[in-house]
């Protein structure tokens, strides 16, 4: 399997997480197969999934052909938490996780007795890399009076150090609840998402200074120029984006919430500030609508990610077939760490289930109002 080595720079917080430095990493991106190779690989993967009694769970950000395979074979295409939850509840004892390493770890934490395989164990995340557990633990130890809330995009060891784990779909509600109870918070690792939640809730939050390689590159000035070209377009923004991008959003939300907004908004054109991988699901969910990628670089500038995560791009048909054939690239989580990491995850799941019941009890109107609560307010 031929591949291209791509060097990657990412935010590497220093000075106890309060100042940004620069870290160096790499991504080994598989070269695209030919049309004939692609067709043969797809058929081989389908047969191997049956042979291995395995199920494929894929993130919205992996390439479209992997998302299609997951859908066609009874798997799942979703955000990281729903991937893990689907795998936990599925009968299959082998889960193939097409995504990045923390997603495989989360799946293993929720399904410790299942075999979790990944196409490439080196597929990582700038947020995970930028929050080493030893440094983060020291940061937490320096502020023992604060509740520790971490984003899903962290290692199992960092989750094990936390009181709560959250996703972008429920983080705001959880922090608002903690704030209402008078709790002060340590937030990690994404500074943009943390700042967004802090402004929306008024919570007392110390922010770790990590960022997502993809979302950090979206540019507010260039987005404003693009909006002038498409004045009727609605702007959909993931909250991992910088403040001057979020400020221009019609909807700020998680991947699933942005797809939902694309369906429900009475508009034909959308500017999308998140990973390009999501456009596949948006186009399926809202056929006939036009989706335009938000800009990641200004004039005469180059982009690091160009709106597609280089580590998500490490998932390909060839290495997916290979992992099914050989049964290697298995995810392991130390049982003691896994047990501790499950506590903040379960705490979030319980909160999310109770929150969902409250929203459903209040009816569809309030749910839609909640979805679009960020219109003009971000």
Swiss-Prot record:
GO terms for cellular component: cytosol. It catalyses: iminosuccinate + dihydroxyacetone phosphate = quinolinate + phosphate + 2 H2O + H(+). Its EC number is 2.5.1.72. GO terms for biological process: 'de novo' NAD biosynthetic process from L-aspartate. It comes from the Bacteria. Iminosuccinate binds at residues 59, 80, 151-153, 168, 238-240, 255. Pathway: Cofactor biosynthesis; NAD(+) biosynthesis; quinolinate from iminoaspartate: step 1/1. One of its GO terms (molecular function) is 4 iron, 4 sulfur cluster binding. Keywords: 4Fe-4S, Cytoplasm, Iron, Iron-sulfur, Metal-binding, Pyridine nucleotide biosynthesis, Transferase. Gene3D superfamilies: NadA-like (3.40.50.10800). Binds 1 [4Fe-4S] cluster per subunit. Pfam families: NadA. It is an enzyme of class 2 (transferase). This is Quinolinate synthase. It comes from Burkholderia lata (strain ATCC 17760 / DSM 23089 / LMG 22485 / NCIMB 9086 / R18194 / 383). The gene is nadA.
């Amino acid at each position: 399997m031929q591949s291209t080595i791509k060097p990657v720079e990412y935010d590497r917080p220093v000075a106890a997480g309060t100042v940004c430095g620069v870290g160096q990493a790499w991504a080994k991106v598989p070269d695209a197969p030919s049309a004939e190779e692609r067709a043969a690989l797809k058929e081989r993967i389908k047969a191997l999934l049956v042979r291995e009694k395995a199920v494929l769970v894929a993130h919205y950000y992996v390439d479209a052909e992997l998302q299609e395979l997951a859908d066609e074979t009874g798997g799942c295409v979703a955000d990281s938490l729903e991937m893990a939850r689907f795998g936990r509840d599925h009968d299959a004892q082998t889960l193939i996780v097409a995504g990045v390493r923390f997603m495989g770890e989360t799946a293993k934490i929720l399904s410790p007795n299942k075999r979790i395989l990944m196409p490439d164990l080196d597929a990582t995340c700038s947020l995970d890399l930028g929050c080493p557990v030893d440094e983060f633990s020291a940061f937490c130890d320096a502020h023992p009076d604060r509740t520790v809330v971490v984003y899903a995009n962290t290692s199992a060891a960092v989750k094990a150090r936390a009181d709560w784990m959250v996703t972008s779909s429920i983080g705001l509600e959880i922090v608002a609840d903690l704030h209402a109870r008078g709790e002060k918070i340590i937030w990690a690792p994404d500074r943009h998402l943390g700042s967004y939640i802090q402004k929306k809730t008024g919570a007392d939050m110390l922010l770790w200074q990590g960022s997502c390689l993809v979302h950090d590159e979206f540019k507010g000035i260039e987005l404003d120029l693009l909006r002038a070209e498409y004045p009727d377009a609605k702007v959909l923004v993931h909250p991992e984006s910088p403040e001057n991008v979020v400020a221009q959003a019609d909807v700020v939300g998680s991947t699933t919430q942005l797809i939902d907004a694309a369906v429900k908004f009475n508009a034909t054109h959308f500017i999308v500030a998140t990973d390009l991988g999501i456009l596949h699901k948006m186009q399926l969910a809202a056929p006939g609508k036009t989706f335009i990628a938000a800009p990641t670089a200004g004039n005469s500038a180059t982009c690091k990610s160009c709106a597609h995560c280089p580590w998500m791009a490490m998932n390909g048909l060839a290495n997916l077939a290979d992992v099914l054939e050989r049964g290697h690239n298995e995810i392991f989580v130390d049982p003691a760490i896994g047990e501790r990491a499950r506590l903040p995850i379960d705490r979030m799941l319980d909160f999310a289930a109770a929150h969902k019941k409250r929203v459903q009890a209040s009816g569809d109107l309030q749910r839609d109002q909640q979805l679009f609560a960020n219109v003009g307010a971000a």
